[in-house]
Design a protein with these regions (language model features):
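Long, acidic, intrinsically disordered low-complexity segments
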Residues: 83-136
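Metallocofactor- and cofactor-centric catalytic cores in central/energy metabolism, strongly enriched
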Residues: 124, 136-160, 190
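Ser/Thr/Pro/Gly-rich low-complexity linker/stalk segments immediately outside membranes or between
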Residues: 34-56
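Second-shell loop/turn segments in exported
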Residues: 133-139, 155-165, 175-182
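Hydrophobic membrane-insertion alpha-helices, especially the h-region
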Residues: 17-30
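Short, thiol/selenol-centered motifs that function as redox-active sites or metal-ligating centers
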Residues: 69, 90-96, 159-172, 204-205
Length: 209
């Protein structure tokens, strides 16, 4: 005696049952393998990285923190071979820190009317870097101007434009020369700009005044 309905294996009803069963298994398999997995963001639940996001934003940080085109071994001679649109992104040494990055960008906003100052030290075009290299190579400081530069080196967190003698050092030395000669900047102004423009990564940073 049968206690439940059991169609014959070769009956049309059995074939329909098998087709439905296969379809259900297929749907379940699709859901299992395509289930949306959480994304591991750098800062917990903040938004995903976006190359086009504004400087200092969570999205821009999450993009830049994984970029490696900026590094200690990169020299200006190499950057001169880049196309002007190519970008040098990320930190050269330590991992970028979210809070320090935002503090730096906030500090740099005070210079927004000086177009030669990069707005984001962790994302600079090769074209802008080449312009700063030009200042580095062509501007000769007087003895008084050199004294201002040397004093700025003593005052800055990194002991100069960067933590290492790389493309960034040369670029920001050139920028400092330009600002001293054509804008009359003093050593304190140069040192603070360098601190805001640090691209070495890590937690050290300068607070905006």
């Amino acid at each position: 005696m049968r206690y439940f309905f059991q169609p014959k294996a070769d009956s049309p009803l059995a074939k329909i049952f098998i087709i439905i069963l296969i379809a259900v298994i297929g749907v379940l398999g699709y859901l299992v393998f395509n289930w949306e997995k959480p994304t591991n963001n750098v800062e917990g639940d903040i938004e995903l990285g976006n190359v086009n996001a504004s400087a200092g934003s969570d999205q821009k940080f999450n993009y830049l923190v994984s970029q490696t085109s900026n590094n200690c071994g990169l020299q200006r001679q190499v950057v001169f071979n880049y196309s002007d649109n190519q970008r040098i992104q990320g930190s050269c040494c330590d991992k970028m820190d979210h809070h320090a990055y935002q503090e730096q960008i906030e500090g740099l906003r005070k210079y927004k009317d000086i177009s030669i100052i990069p707005t984001d030290p962790y994302d600079i075009s090769a074209g802008q870097a080449k312009q700063l290299f030009k200042y580095f190579e062509e501007i000769k400081l007087t003895s008084d101007q050199q004294a201002t530069y040397n004093e700025a080196m003593k005052m800055s967190d990194e002991g100069g434009p960067c933590c290492c003698k790389c493309w960034h050092w040369d670029a920001y030395e050139g920028l400092a020369k330009k600002l001293i000669v054509d804008y009359g900047w003093n050593s304190e102004q140069i040192a603070q700009l360098w601190d805001f423009s640090d691209a070495c990564g890590g937690t050290g940073h300068e607070h905006a005044a």
